[in-house]
């Protein structure tokens, strides 16, 4: 019986040791997972910020080009329709500079709402059922 009890005691110690190792392993795995998730999240955020900045810069460049074309086109239309004589049209203005100045002016209203706020649907009028007169 003594041998049997000693064997059970050893088995119990083995189970306790295994449980401790498992607990330690799970804790380490959870910590590594957390680190991995935080790393991926930070890299994703950096990528999004870079992407937004890149898109904003390209949009600004395109607006500058478009503004220059519109400015030149407006001058040509004004001259062609006789509103302005070609000689009277200012030649010292460069369309690219005018478009660049327009692109750099601050907006009166922000394009996006402050963080944490969302657009809400406008209130809908209640539906009234229409009954035709007999």
From Swiss-Prot:
Sequence repeat locations: 20-30, 31-41, 42-56, 57-67
One record GO biological process: synapse organization
GO molecular function, one term: calcium ion binding
Protein's UniProt keywords contain Cytoplasm: yes
Any Gene Ontology CC annotation: axon terminus
Record's compositionally biased regions (Acidic residues): 98-134
Gene3D superfamilies per record: Helix hairpin bin
Keyword Cytoplasm set for record: yes
Chief location: cytoplasm
Keywords: Cytoplasm, Phosphoprotein, Repeat
Start and end residues of each stretch annotated as 4 X 11 AA tandem repeats of [EGS]-K-T-K-[EQ]-[GQ]-V-X(4): 20-67
Residues covered by region (Disordered): 89-134
Tissue distribution: Expressed predominantly in brain; concentrated in presynaptic nerve terminals.
Processing after translation: Phosphorylated. Phosphorylation by G-protein coupled receptor kinases (GRK) is more efficient than phosphorylation by CK1, CK2 and CaM-kinase II.
Localization annotation: Cytoplasm
Highest taxon of the lineage: Eukaryota
Sites of Phosphoserine modification: 118
Main function: Non-amyloid component of senile plaques found in Alzheimer disease. Could act as a regulator of SNCA aggregation process. Protects neurons from staurosporine and 6-hydroxy dopamine (6OHDA)-stimulated caspase activation in a p53/TP53-dependent manner. Contributes to restore the SNCA anti-apoptotic function abolished by 6OHDA. Not found in the Lewy bodies associated with Parkinson disease.
Family: Belongs to the synuclein family.
Protein name: Beta-synuclein
Organism: Homo sapiens
């Amino acid at each position: 019986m003594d041998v049997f009890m000693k064997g059970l005691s050893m088995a119990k110690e083995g189970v306790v040791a295994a449980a401790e190792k498992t607990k330690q392993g799970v804790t380490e795995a959870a910590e590594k997972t957390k680190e991995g998730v935080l790393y991926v999240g930070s890299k994703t955020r950096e990528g999004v910020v870079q992407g937004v900045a890149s898109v904003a810069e390209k949009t600004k460049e395109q607006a500058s080009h478009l503004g220059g074309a519109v400015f030149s086109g407006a001058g040509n239309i004004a001259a062609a329709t006789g509103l302005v004589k070609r000689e009277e049209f200012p030649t010292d203005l460069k369309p690219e500079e005018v478009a660049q100045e327009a692109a750099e002016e601050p907006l009166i209203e922000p394009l996006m709402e402050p963080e944490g706020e969302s657009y809400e649907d406008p209130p809908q009028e209640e539906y009234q059922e229409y009954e035709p007169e007999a």
